[in-house]
Amino acid sequence: MTAQESLPLGRDVAGVDEVGRGCLFGPVFAAAVVLEGSAAECLLKAGLTDSKKLSAKRRAALVPLIQSLCVASALGQASAREIDACGIRVATERAMLRALQRLPQSPGLVLVDGNLPLRLWHGPQRTVIAGDSRSAAIAAASVLAKEARDALIRRLSARFPGYGLERHAGYGTAQHRQSLIDSGPTPLHRHTFLKRLLG
């Protein structure tokens, strides 16, 4: 984790991040996390960083620690149907907004991972490029969102066997693409994402 000193923490600051933006299947998830400095230090010592850099075992171990140490956390999601209807950027913003609105108190500042502002949020915000590697609050949000989405996709894999969802979590792996060609999409696939693949 780098440049922590330049990014605020505290009871009035929420970090927000999304997961599943590039998937072919299922919803896009977001999480919002409020962390005080002492909790951030504990989490960083426990190995907190960008969820993409963590093993599944490490991420799973961090979830209860984040939940016990944070001031507040919340999840939001936008469905594949919403993604098809309004596009991935708007759907991602909706998921982030839903997470922020589920916090017990509206944050005075939102740290948004990436370089695109959250257009639906009307309070103060700051975009943070590579935020999940620079802000403990954003990193914690990335872990919670990733674990929650992966758990949902594992449950859905039982409803839709044959697509390997439990292995690739809905991302466009070669196996997933071949399953789509062989069997066609499910109702929970993002049909607008499949036009090039399936014609």
UniProtKB/Swiss-Prot annotation:
Gene Ontology MF, one: manganese ion binding
GO BP term (any one): DNA replication, removal of RNA primer
Record's cofactor remark: Manganese or magnesium. Binds 1 divalent metal ion per monomer in the absence of substrate. May bind a second metal ion after substrate binding.
E.C. number: 3.1.26.4
Protein name, as recorded: Ribonuclease HII
Alphabetical list of CDD domains matching this protein: RNase_HII_bacteria_HII_like
Record's keyword annotation contains RNA-binding: no
